[in-house]
Amino acid sequence: MLRWLRDFVLPTAACQDAEQPTRYETLFQALDRNGDGVVDIGELQEGLRNLGIPLGQDAEEKIFTTGDVNKDGKLDFEEFMKYLKDHEKKMKLAFKSLDKNNDGKIEASEIVQSLQTLGLTISEQQAELILQSIDVDGTMTVDWNEWRDYFLFNPVTDIEEIIRFWKHSTGIDIGDSLTIPDEFTEDEKKSGQWWRQLLAGGIAGAVSRTSTAPLDRLKIMMQVHGSKSDKMNIFGGFRQMVKEGGIRSLWRGNGTNVIKIAPETAVKFWAYEQYKKLLTEEGQKIGTFERFISGSMAGATAQTFIYPMEVMKTRLAVGKTGQYSGIYDCAKKILKHEGLGAFYKGYVPNLLGIIPYAGIDLAVYELLKSYWLDNFAKDSVNPGVMVLLGCGALSSTCGQLASYPLALVRTRMQAQAMLEGSPQLNMVGLFRRIISKEGIPGLYRGITPNFMKVLPAVGISYVVYENMKQTLGVTQK
């Protein structure tokens, strides 16, 4: 069908200027099923599918958003032809950006090279899968005609869009702060899309964390109070919190957890860009290892900056009703009774937890990505929303599992000054005490509610993130 499209709609360059309007008119008439001189979205959807023309995700809606100049919900022939001409210019630029050796063909090695400049590494075998979805004649190269035919009615015109499916972040926020920052392309940085995406992610994180705050507070309570002698389970923990402070107490500490999103994201993003510059030469691609090191160091920098808020979040969550009137009161009392050093209790295990979390999170995601591309990417490199969310959630969960003992010790160090009769132990002392009294399972107290919040957090943050991207103009509605 792509061959038919090339011969029928898109003539050779020699006669293109003379015949193109006629060819476009013939295609327009084929789409205009009722012959009223305009094409609505229903006719476009049905016509393109009948012609076997490949479409991207939500392609018809995006075509109408771009091409429907007078916003009457229909495309007349002039709008239709203008859209195709403008779109073809963009496709030509995208093709040239990929054709590194200017031989008029795109090869697998050129796709690998282009993605490397964007900070994304794939194998040549995976690049061949991208080619297979576009290549018509089986040469394992894509010429301009094949490229144009494939993306004629596909709003994806940029190589960055093609591989953006597999960016590690999809707007997921499961409440942790140790993930490696997003990788933004040069175009996103220049156009200002990067800050819109960060803002959308921040809002999604705020909604997601607020929605799952009761489970987060329960996790903290079980980390601090759970032991063999005081077996706090999920239902008992919720009953105890509601009995002590009412329904509203389930969200105690959430305000701090939400407020810290903005400064943490800003510092992490800035630090990540600086560390990348230190670890790579100008214009050089950033590999997976350099990305891991840069991301880990950026996470450590951001955590150093906002760590006092982490301590206050724990103190507010563990505190009893009336103990603190708010964030400011909590900070004032900690400073008065324990001094400035109290704001960094648990800082060492928190920093140590970044390495296993970020490393395993990134490694598992890359492993899942490679497995899907090698085994399931038959006709398209787009894995779909469910696969992306599943990979992101699973990799984050594995990272949490590896770093959880350090997170538990961090939380106990943050809160132990509040517990009457509790000795003020350092990290090593707490590890020894927990293992001797509670065994290895003691290092995983509270992990059940932590895992319980993953699925709702993923779903909520993704939905909010996608809607906010539309609102902020990152994606078309």
Curated annotation (Swiss-Prot):
It catalyses: Mg(2+)(out) + phosphate(in) + ATP(out) = Mg(2+)(in) + phosphate(out) + ATP(in); ADP(out) + phosphate(in) + H(+)(out) = ADP(in) + phosphate(out) + H(+)(in); AMP(out) + phosphate(in) = AMP(in) + phosphate(out); phosphate(in) + ATP(out) + 2 H(+)(out) = phosphate(out) + ATP(in) + 2 H(+)(in). The chain crosses the membrane at residues 198-215, 253-272, 296-309, 346-365, 389-406, 446-465. One of its GO terms (molecular function) is ADP:phosphate antiporter activity. Ca(2+) 4 binds at residues 135, 137, 139, 141, 146. InterPro entries: EF-hand-dom_pair (IPR011992), EF_Hand_1_Ca_BS (IPR018247), EF_hand_dom (IPR002048), GDC-like (IPR002167), Mit_carrier (IPR002067), Mitochondrial_sb/sol_carrier (IPR018108), Mt_carrier_dom_sf (IPR023395). Ca(2+) 3 binds at residues 99, 101, 103, 105, 110. It comes from the Eukaryota. Ca(2+) 1 binds at residues 32, 34, 36, 38, 43. The modification N6-acetyllysine is found at residues 320, 336, 437. GO terms for biological process: adenine nucleotide transport; ADP transport; ATP transport; cellular response to calcium ion; cellular response to oxidative stress; mitochondrial ATP transmembrane transport; mitochondrial transport. Residues 1-197, 273-295, 366-388, 466-477 are mitochondrial intermembrane. Monomer. The regulatory N-terminal domain/NTD formed of two pairs of fused calcium-binding EF-hands, binds calcium in the mitochondrial intermembrane space and regulates the antiporter activity of the transmembrane domain/TMD. In absence of calcium, the apo form of the N-terminal domain is intrinsically disordered and binds to the transmembrane domain, inhibiting the transporter activity. Binding of calcium leads to a major conformational change and abolishes the interaction with the transmembrane domain and the inhibition of the transporter activity. The C-terminal mitochondrial carrier domain/transmembrane domain/TMD bears the transmembrane transporter activity. Belongs to the mitochondrial carrier (TC 2.A.29) family. This is Mitochondrial adenyl nucleotide antiporter SLC25A24. It comes from Homo sapiens (Human). The lineage of its organism: Eukaryota, Metazoa, Chordata, Craniata, Vertebrata. The gene is SLC25A24.
